[in-house]
């Protein structure tokens, strides 16, 4: 999969730069999401791995996408088809989303708790994480009864475990050593 990421990066960067320049980042993300879903369809996967000429492949792909792709989106599909890169569309979308998050200076923060958190608690968590990460954050809240009480916060590879379950696990580790 890392090969797909490496191959997808220049396509995602080009699409993102174009989208920013033309103030159409939302539209481009929608187009890429649709194209990635088409490319990951089982029948389309078979077609992409077949021996179709790049022109025929891009025409078929664009016809299937219909009005979902504008002219610039169709051009991206044509270039990717010419280079045999259509199977990497999902990775292109993932890279595009990462570029957008970096551009928007936002970080995805997962907050796991045993119960629904109040708006005041979410505001405090958001403010603390914005200060710690030096960027705006988008909270994705999840409920997990096994947490017992407290919260687990994940942002990228950082994990803050303030749950009772985590404390009990750490206590058990100390007692066993």
Swiss-Prot record:
Main location: membrane
Subunit structure, as described in the record: F-type ATPases have 2 components, F(1) - the catalytic core - and F(0) - the membrane proton channel. F(1) has five subunits: alpha(3), beta(3), gamma(1), delta(1), epsilon(1). F(0) has three main subunits: a(1), b(2) and c(10-14). The alpha and beta chains form an alternating ring which encloses part of the gamma chain. F(1) is attached to F(0) by a central stalk formed by the gamma and epsilon chains, while a peripheral stalk is formed by the delta and b chains.
Signal peptide (residue range): none
Function: F(1)F(0) ATP synthase produces ATP from ADP in the presence of a proton or sodium gradient. F-type ATPases consist of two structural domains, F(1) containing the extramembraneous catalytic core and F(0) containing the membrane proton channel, linked together by a central stalk and a peripheral stalk. During catalysis, ATP synthesis in the catalytic domain of F(1) is coupled via a rotary mechanism of the central stalk subunits to proton translocation. This protein is part of the stalk that links CF(0) to CF(1). It either transmits conformational changes from CF(0) to CF(1) or is implicated in proton conduction.
InterPro entries membership: ATP_synth_OSCP/delta_N_sf, ATPase_OSCP/d_CS, ATPase_OSCP/dsu
Pfam families on file: OSCP
Domain of life: Bacteria
Organism of origin: Erwinia tasmaniensis (strain DSM 17950 / CFBP 7177 / CIP 109463 / NCPPB 4357 / Et1/99)
Chain coiled-coil ranges: none
Family designation: Belongs to the ATPase delta chain family.
GO molecular function: proton-transporting ATP synthase activity, rotational mechanism
GO CC annotation terms, alphabetical: plasma membrane; proton-transporting ATP synthase complex
Membrane topology reported for the UniProt record: Peripheral membrane protein
NCBIfam families named among the record's database cross-references: ATP_synt_delta (TIGR01145), PRK05758.2-2 (NF004402), PRK05758.2-5 (NF004404)
Keywords: ATP synthesis, Cell inner membrane, Cell membrane, CF(1), Hydrogen ion transport, Ion transport, Membrane, Transport
Subcellular location: Cell inner membrane
High-level lineage: Bacteria, Pseudomonadati, Pseudomonadota, Gammaproteobacteria, Enterobacterales
HAMAP family: ATP_synth_delta_bact
Protein name, UniProt field: ATP synthase subunit delta
């Amino acid at each position: 999969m890392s090969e797909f990421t490496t191959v997808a990066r220049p396509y995602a960067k080009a699409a993102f730069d174009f989208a920013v320049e033309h103030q159409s980042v939302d539209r481009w993300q929608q187009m890429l999401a649709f194209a990635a879903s088409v490319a990951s369809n089982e029948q389309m996967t078979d077609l992409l791995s077949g021996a179709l000429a790049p022109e025929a492949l891009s025409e078929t792909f664009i016809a299937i996408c219909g009005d979902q792709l504008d002219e610039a989106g169709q051009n991206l599909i044509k270039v990717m088809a010419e280079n045999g890169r259509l199977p990497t569309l999902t990775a292109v979308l993932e890279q595009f989303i990462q570029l957008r998050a970096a551009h928007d200076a936002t970080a995805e923060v997962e907050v796991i708790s045993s119960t629904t958190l109040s708006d005041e608690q979410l505001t405090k968590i958001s403010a603390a994480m914005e200060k710690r990460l030096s960027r705006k954050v988008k909270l994705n809240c999840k409920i997990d009864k096994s947490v017992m009480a407290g919260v687990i916060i994940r942002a990228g590879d950082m994990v803050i475990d303030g749950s009772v379950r985590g404390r009990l696990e750490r206590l058990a580790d100390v007692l066993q050593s």
